UniProtKB/Swiss-Prot annotation:
NDH-1 shuttles electrons from NADH, via FMN and iron-sulfur (Fe-S) centers, to quinones in the respiratory chain. Couples the redox reaction to proton translocation (for every two electrons transferred, four hydrogen ions are translocated across the cytoplasmic membrane), and thus conserves the redox energy in a proton gradient. This is NADH-quinone oxidoreductase subunit M. The gene is nuoM. InterPro entries: NADH_Q_OxRdtase_chainM/4, NADH_UbQ_OxRdtase, ND/Mrp_TM. The lineage of its organism: Bacteria, Pseudomonadati, Pseudomonadota, Alphaproteobacteria, Rickettsiales. The keyword Methyltransferase does not apply.
Length: 493
């Protein structure tokens, strides 16, 4: 049986679609070019999603090594190969990328009013680059995809964002690019000593690098991924980016891009510098605890819905980093689960805020109230997403936070109790948000004319709601897939 290069298909199908749109549809003289662009974008995202689901179905969870490996020579002089594969850690992020991209593209067909062709092209490019980064086994290839993601996201915020979109886009780009410079310099040094970028090979050799140099490299790479998560004090770009980004941009930003921080720690930092990671872990843990409490308190004071959810993301990603740097199976498994759960819950919340914004054209909490009486379906969806965000048992949010706290409890009891306070604060600000937006009397007359969710909005939000419940009730179906990969990662710890 001929084996398909299924990962290459997942990476390059969106790129080929972009080329087709730009080279053929754009040159067409037909008046309905935009319709053809929409068809191509939807078909491409559907096929890419199917290909990633095929990978997920065929994946052998009893094998912790990379699977579906493809390896082709490229630029041997600098150690660059097209070397891709998936393991238990990366496979769900690949599926999440294609799933959220499909949701964003479908929703965009009904909400984007200008430059729809360019908008869809940006999302297809981002899908390709994200899948490429999550599947890269060559460290330099990972860096190239990791950096390429910046460009379409910058354009999405800068062109289709809100009133202060240029400022937010520049801030996003400069922060992320700043961190990536340190990453690039580290790669150059590593290659000068090891002459290899194979992620299955170089972890065995980085121990030969002098300890002080390892420490410098560790901090350089840590900063690159800390900006992505983001960890305080590298977080200030995120609230601005979320507030100004269009709804679909916020979905991709929260659902996928923030995950590269935690994924980078798991894929690059811990394997390459295991001993130094143990040495500096306590600092990361306390930074994460500070981030959880600080972001939760700031979220509590917000008057803008998207900014509140943005700060809640910083708090939730804090549980990811404490789980990772606990170096326990429970903690790391919880961190991966938390990233997946947050990707689903935060995406759902941003879509819900987007539906409200489409009707009232404001994200200010005080302008709402009593929406549930006019939009009961949305109110139900919002309730489930909100309960997932606060970590109610039976939802996906509970599993990740519980395992992360269980992992860190074995290492640092004080940090565990402080981090647990973040869960209480999270419940306070999310319940407050729901109460002020959905419940009470209708004080804004425009809300009287609201109609409940349109079909395309239900199609976008309902699958995420189902995943929040499924992940919460059947967590073992997710945890078992990456259990052996986590055990393999933690051998050095």
């Amino acid at each position: 049986m001929l084996e398909l290069p299924i990962i290459s298909i997942s990476i390059f199908l969106p790129l080929i679609s972009v080329l087709y749109i730009l080279l053929f549809i754009s040159q067409s003289k037909k008046a309905d070019k935009a319709i053809y662009v929409m068809y191509v974008a939807v078909l491409s995202s559907v096929l890419t999603f199917i290909s990633t689901i095929y990978i997920l179905i065929e994946f052998d969870s009893s094998n912790p090594a990379y699977q579906f490996i493809e390896r082709y020579a490229w630029l041997d002089k600098i150690g660059l190969e097209f070397h891709v594969g998936v393991d238990g850690i990366s496979i769900f992020f690949v599926a999440l990328t294609s799933f959220l991209t499909l949701i964003c593209i479908i929703g965009s067909l009904f909400t984007v009013k200008k430059y729809i062709k360019e908008y869809l092209v940006c999302f297809l490019l981002m899908e390709s680059f994200c899948i490429g980064a999550f599947t890269s086994v060559n460290l330099l290839l990972f860096y190239l995809f990791f950096e390429a993601i910046l460009v379409p996201m910058y354009i999405i915020i800068g062109v289709w964002g809100g009133e202060n979109r240029i400022y937010a886009a520049l801030k996003f780009f400069l922060y992320t690019f700043f961190g990536s410079v340190f990453f690039l310099l580290s790669l150059i040094y590593i290659y000068s000593k090891i002459h290899n970028f194979d992620l299955t090979y170089i972890p065995e050799l980085t121990g030969n690098i002098p300890l002080f140099t390892q420490q410098i490299l560790w901090w350089a790479i840590f900063i690159a991924f800390a900006v992505k998560i983001p960890i305080i004090p590298f977080h200030t770009w995120l609230p601005d980016a979320h507030v100004q980004a269009p709804t679909s941009g916020s979905v991709i930003l929260a659902g996928i891009l923030l995950k590269f921080g935690g994924y980078g720690f798991l894929r690059v930092l811990l394997p390459l510098f295991s001993s130094v990671s143990q040495e500096f872990a306590i600092y990361v843990i306390y930074l994460s605890v500070i981030a959880i409490i600080y972001a939760s308190l700031v979220a509590l004071a917000q008057k803008d819905m998207k900014k509140m959810i943005a700060y809640s993301s910083i708090a939730h990603m804090g549980y990811v980093t404490i789980g990772i740097f606990s170096f326990t199976e429970a903690g790391v498994s919880g961190a991966i689960f938390q990233m997946l759960s947050h990707g689903v819950i935060s995406s759902c919340l941003f879509l819900i805020v987007g539906t409200l914004y489409e009707r009232l054209h404001t994200k200010e909490i005080a302008k709402y109230g009593g929406v549930a009486s006019k939009m009961p379906v949305l109110a139900t969806f919002f309730m489930i997403a909100m309960l997932g965000s606060v970590g109610l048992p039976g939802t996906s949010g509970f599993i990740g936070e519980f395992l992360s706290l269980l992992g860190i409890y074995k290492v640092n009891v004080i940090a565990t109790f402080i981090a647990a306070l973040g869960i209480i604060l999270g419940a306070v600000y999310m319940l407050k948000l729901y109460k002020e937006v959905m419940l009470g009397e209708i004080t804004n007359k425009e809300i009287m004319h609201f109609r409940d969710l349109y079909k395309y909005e239900i199609i976008s939000i309902a699958p995420l709601i189902l995943l929040i419940i499924y992940f919460g009730l059947m967590p073992s179906s997710i945890l078992n897939v990456f259990r052996l990969s986590v055990e393999s990662l933690l051998v050095k710890f």
